[in-house]
Amino acid sequence: MPDFRSVFVGGIRLSAAIVSALVDSDEGLQAVFCPSPEAASNHDDYVRLKPYAGDSNYHEYEDINAPGTVEKIAQYEPDVVYVIGVSQILKRPLLDTPTVGCLGGHIALLPANRGCNPIIWAIANGLSQHGVT
């Protein structure tokens, strides 16, 4: 087992790029968890991550906080859980699973610009500032 173990959770275009980079880095990506197409029906930029997961284990979920999903993630004994492109708020059982913590990101300034397609909304709303949280 590698010295550093990670799990990735997400399912948007940005998630695919990050999973590809993690696979290429050979830095201990144990598993990729992606929302099922049904669970991600509100994401127009949904990407099924299986083609990007390489040799990492791949799982699809309906609810990232469901006890069964959290148990599957815990089986990989992750040091870090990366979270990009998830529309659910992670609850305490999942947050407590990795030994180091969860690292997430959103391509907008939160909480004001939460939700899908924040770059498009920033342009549409004429925002003069945009960022990453």
Predicted regions and their residues:
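One-carbon transfer enzymes
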Residues: 1-133
